[in-house]
Amino acid sequence: MKVLHVCSELYPLLKTGGLADVLGALPAAQKEIGLDARILIPAYPAISAGIPDTGVVAEFHNSAAGHVVLRYGEFNGVGVYLIDAPNLYAREGNPYHDQWYNDYADNYKRFALLGWVGAELATGLDPWWMAEVVHAHDWHAGLTSAYLAYKGRPAKSVFTIHNLAYQGLFAYHHLFEIGLPTSMFNVNGLEFYGQISYLKAGLYYSDAVTAVSPTYAREITTPEFAYGFEGLLSTLHSQGKLVGILNGVDDNIWNPNTDGYIQDHYKLKSMTGKKKNKAALQAHFNLPEKPDALLFVMITRLTEQKGVDLLIQSAENIIKQGGQLALLGSGAPSLESALLGLAHKHPKNIAVKIGYDEPLSHLMVAGGDVILVPSRFEPCGLTQLYGLKYGTLPLVRQTGGLADTVVDSTAENIKERRATGFVFNEANSQALSHAISRAFSLWKKQRTWFTVRTVAMEQDFSWQISARRYEELYRRI
């Protein structure tokens, strides 16, 4: 089965979030189980630099982009089509906005071309390979399904929601420029409150829609999580067209026994390396090297969605019980300054690095005792999965993929060898603080802690499992 993934990020070449991690791993896992999976992505500078050896598949003229060349190369064993359109894509840095965080004014053209080429690869743009399933990811690729529908559905279409908060909204008058008829601009189509929504195109015109966890798939049928799409998503859910499939963990990148970013490897039967990573992490952050101090880590975008404000309000509980907190991330200036203020006030307990640092993130997952993911909503979440794999117990809010992947350390769950971390329900600082206290209580019972840690490390969230679930879906539609 020939599967084309249409996307705008690819780990490790270009990443702004978890979307890149998925595309860096899922197509390769699908190839391993026998699917012929390929990727379509704009030829951003970082992508072109990472895939330098390409051949020309097709050339054409586009009114928005001018001369366009469709190239083909390979990356990590997976075939990749690159849309070489310098007028639209030859921009360094973030693929969606400029250095001042202003969205590019021509994003409607940039991502319409991505969707159009995705549909054309199902109808012969590459005469040697024709997609049977076109799998689009997030709003950037949402128009793919609309173009396929306009062409009479020459291939099956699947659309994955990684984050419903970003909807790809553009003015109605751009409809003519993107080559779609006015008949598609209505409630049963592209229209969303008077604008074109590329996200809605993906939701409405696809044969199946997936969310990146079963719980998130249910949550987005409710007004609290649906951003105005609850009617459409509820309909899709009742028709069996909306399903949740968990993301996986790329074992080539995230594995404590082979991790290329850490010096001291370890595995379930030999955990000495974890203690060494903890000491190295404490040294890196200039925290006192205390093996007995409970060390919390958090790697995140600094936004209220991620519950960072809840942590700021609860940090006192970590300090008062003699714990330590190491945090890596960037985002809202108010949250950055509040965290830096805490670190300045409590240098023996709290350390903060503003920015993103891939090697450091691996050391933090390897060296921490608890990884914090107190999100208000979380479609899937990846850091809690890394924590499980590295024996760094996740402390999470019961939402989205966090609810599907972490089992709370209640007495009953511990006894049944099911517990893998700490879970709290309400999105407030009191609930988070109580969960932090429960982590300290368990830390005092080291034998029980080791039992929970063992169960956590035994969990299997490999991409092969996810790849098989997607294959089942492709064959069903």
Curated annotation (Swiss-Prot):
UniProt xrefs under Pfam families: Glyco_transf_5 (PF08323), Glycos_transf_1 (PF00534)
Domain of life: Bacteria
Classification via Gene3D superfamilies: Glycogen Phosphorylase B
SUPFAM superfamilies linked to this entry: UDP-Glycosyltransferase/glycogen phosphorylase (SSF53756)
Enzyme nomenclature, EC number: 2.4.1.21
Pathway assigned to this chain's UniProt record: Glycan biosynthesis; glycogen biosynthesis
GO biological process: glycogen biosynthetic process
Cysteines paired by S-S bonds: none
Catalytic reactions of this protein: [(1->4)-alpha-D-glucosyl](n) + ADP-alpha-D-glucose = [(1->4)-alpha-D-glucosyl](n+1) + ADP + H(+)
Signal sequence residues: none
Database matches in InterPro entries: Glyco_trans_1, GS/SS, Starch_synth_cat_dom
Any one GO molecular function term: alpha-1,4-glucan glucosyltransferase (UDP-glucose donor) activity
GO cellular component term of the entry, any: cytosol
Record-listed ADP-alpha-D-glucose binding positions: K15
Keywords assigned: Glycogen biosynthesis, Glycosyltransferase, Transferase
Biological function: Synthesizes alpha-1,4-glucan chains using ADP-glucose.
HAMAP family per UniProt: Glycogen_synth (MF_00484)
Family of this protein: Belongs to the glycosyltransferase 1 family. Bacterial/plant glycogen synthase subfamily.
PANTHER family (alphabetical): ALPHA AMYLASE DOMAIN-CONTAINING PROTEIN, GRANULE-BOUND STARCH SYNTHASE 1, CHLOROPLASTIC/AMYLOPLASTIC
Protein name stated in the entry: Glycogen synthase
Protein's organism: Mannheimia succiniciproducens (strain KCTC 0769BP / MBEL55E)
